[in-house]
């Protein structure tokens, strides 16, 4: 078994270990002033759902799904989530809001629930099949899917340094398999801390032949329990290996226990292939974690601090020696179901294990010299294990103990969040540092479904793409219709490189930095490699330092200082001969 921790520490890969790509898919229900599910159609102002990259619908016509593009940091992903919320909330009809809870407090009658009115008839038919098997009430439950990809350079380094005889693709899949195994084993910790679907009305259980859940008692997370969205008891899929996973998925479909591969539900999903069998050739590209409830106290469904916590929790799953077996994963599922149905104000039955994992995370954070804010977040989670009322579910129970009706309480929060979106009606939260003209353009592009590529945020450079057409835009108004756009692109090294890469040209990998502290923190990524440290925009050779054979930390630090003397932003990129 590969000792990833040893390799990371020995070869000073901590900075690279902490880098990843992230994306969020957040489902919600549209509700009325009274807190009931909206009966209106998906707003036409959002354009066609068949291609929209940011705003889709999940199961129901009333259930928008907000999708961030994959981003290189939690901060950037959160900014996109804020921006898409601004667009959706300011585009909804007057008197409509986004429900901040996973389970609607006021569940509509079955005949009032409309499946999403999609162009693709097979997509509609599939949703109607789900209704026949699982009922439409469970389909009305919303949550968050957290997509996670390790830095590909880290995977390559670990592969090379481990001496593995496996191919790079096989090794990458092994890495993600280990993370998936351990997530299933320890997922209960997330349910304890972040679970927030504490109750449901009687009609929610209409497809259950029997249930032992007292409806007058709160739980941590109905959505994550055996009463959540789960497959039938006779559906069994192994996560032991990709081969076993593919074989079992296909068997479930051919025997009729699943109508399609996508019907299989798990709290973690392998991504990188449209069909399970393609994983055998493509390997696992990234993981999708589907466990998370909406946090009603978080304006955008999840606090940014919890996103950071999830990031480093996932890294810890790779850091530890353990690679959970099938038996250990089954234990993890049982612990998760048990945790989900606990009283939110009572300590976890597995408190000792939870505290042990979090203490282990703190040790990892110290070893990799993580930012202090991450350790502070983990310490807050330790406090939540010691004080259950600090968990999301615990906070919900305490809020409702004041006696307010849950439907009215949820509607009040929904109205508060919509008011916040309208507080600065011409700004786009998440991108308020950009020029107002660029913010307005981005708002319209997100609303209509034009794909935005942030070429250079600090220079107000973006591109907009629709099908095969692409426009480069600077300052919100300069496009190909302006003859000066070409020189402006050529003047900006970051934009030039991105456009060249988009068109198939080989360009050196680089990091862009806006502070010396950030550049110095990443020294370990460039140590021992040929690099160039240079200003982002200044030409004439000013402020450039070249290290063909790598730089010592002292020389790297000096080069960073020299580059910042010539420009506000700098690049550190691979040195290429020629």
Model-derived regions, located:
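Sequence termini and other peripheral, non-core segments
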Residues: 1-55, 335-436, 440-447, 476
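Terminal catalytic/cofactor-binding subdomain
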Residues: 1-131, 138-142, 178
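Loop-rich catalytic cores of soluble enzymes, especially ATP-dependent carboxylate-amine ligases
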Residues: 9-10, 106, 117-136, 140, ...
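Long, well-ordered alpha-helical scaffolding segments within enzyme catalytic domains
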Residues: 79-93, 158-195, 301-326
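Substrate-recognition/cap regions that form aromatic- and gly/pro-loop-enriched pockets
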Residues: 290-368
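ATP-binding N-terminal substructure of ATP-dependent carboxylate-amine bond-forming enzymes
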Residues: 424-491, 495-498, 517
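Active-site nucleotide/adenylate-binding loops and adjacent lid/helix of ATP-dependent enzymes
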Residues: 475-478, 482-578
């Amino acid at each position: 078994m590969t000792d990833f921790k040893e390799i990371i520490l020995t070869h000073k890969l901590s900075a690279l270990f902490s880098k990843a790509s992230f994306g969020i898919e957040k489902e919600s229900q549209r509700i009325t002033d009274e807190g009931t599910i909206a009966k209106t159609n998906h707003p036409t102002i959002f354009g066609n759902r068949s291609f929209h990259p940011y705003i889709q619908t999940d199961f129901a016509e009333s259930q928008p799904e907000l999708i961030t593009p994959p981003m290189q940091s939690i901060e950037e992903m959160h900014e996109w989530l804020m921006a898409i919320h601004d667009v959706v909330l300011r585009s909804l009809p007057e008197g409509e809001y986004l429900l901040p809870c996973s389970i609607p407090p006021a569940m509509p009658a079955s005949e009032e629930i409309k499946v999403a009115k999609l162009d693709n008839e097979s997509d509609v038919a599939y949703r109607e099949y789900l209704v026949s098997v699982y009922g439409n009430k469970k389909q009305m439950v919303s949550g968050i899917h957290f997509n996670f990809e390790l830095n590909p350079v880290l995977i390559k380094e670990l592969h090379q340094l481990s001496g593995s005889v496996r191919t790079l693709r096989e090794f990458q899949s092994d890495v993600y398999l280990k993370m998936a195994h351990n997530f299933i084993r320890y997922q209960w910790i997330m349910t304890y801390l972040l679970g927030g679907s504490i109750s449901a009305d009687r009609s929610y259980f209409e497809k259950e032949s029997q249930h032992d859940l007292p409806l007058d008692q709160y739980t941590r997370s109905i959505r994550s329990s055996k009463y959540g969205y789960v497959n039938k008891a006779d559906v069994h899929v192994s996560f032991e290996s990709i081969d076993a996973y593919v074989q079992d998925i296909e068997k479930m479909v051919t025997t009729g226990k699943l109508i399609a591969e996508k019907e299989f539900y798990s709290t973690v999903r392998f991504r990188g292939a449209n069909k399970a069998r393609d994983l055998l050739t493509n390997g696992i590209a990234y993981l999708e974690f589907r466990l998370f409830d909406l946090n009603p106290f978080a304006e955008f469904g999840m606090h940014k601090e919890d996103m950071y916590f999830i990031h480093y929790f996932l890294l810890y799953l790779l850091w530890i020696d353990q690679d959970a077996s099938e038996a250990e994963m089954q234990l993890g599922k049982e612990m998760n179901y048990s945790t989900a149905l606990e009283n939110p104000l009572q300590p976890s039955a597995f408190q000792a294990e939870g505290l042990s994992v979090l203490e282990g995370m703190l040790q990892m954070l110290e070893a990799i010299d993580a930012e202090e804010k991450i350790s502070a977040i983990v310490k807050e989670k330790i406090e939540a294990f010691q004080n259950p009322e600090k968990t999301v579910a615990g906070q919900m129970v305490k809020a409702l103990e004041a006696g307010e009706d849950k439907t009215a309480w949820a509607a009040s929060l929904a109205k508060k969040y919509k008011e916040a979106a309208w507080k600065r009606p011409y700004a786009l939260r998440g991108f308020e540092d950009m020029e107002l003209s660029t913010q307005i353009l981005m708002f319209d592009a997100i609303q209509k479904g034009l794909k935005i590529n942030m070429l250079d945020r600090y220079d107000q450079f973006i591109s907009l793409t629709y099908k095969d057409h692409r426009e480069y835009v600077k300052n919100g108004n300069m496009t190909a219709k302006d003859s000066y756009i070409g020189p402006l692109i050529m003047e900006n090294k970051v934009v030039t490189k991105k456009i060249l890469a988009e068109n198939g040209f080989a360009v050196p990998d680089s990091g862009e930095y806006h502070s010396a502290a950030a550049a110095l923190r990443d020294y370990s990524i460039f140590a021992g490699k040929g690099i160039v440290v240079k200003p982002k925009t200044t030409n004439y050779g000013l402020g450039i330092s070249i290290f063909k054979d790598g730089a010592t930390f002292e020389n790297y630090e000096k080069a960073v200082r020299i580059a910042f003397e010539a420009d506000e932003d700098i690049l550190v990129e691979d040195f290429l001969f020629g």
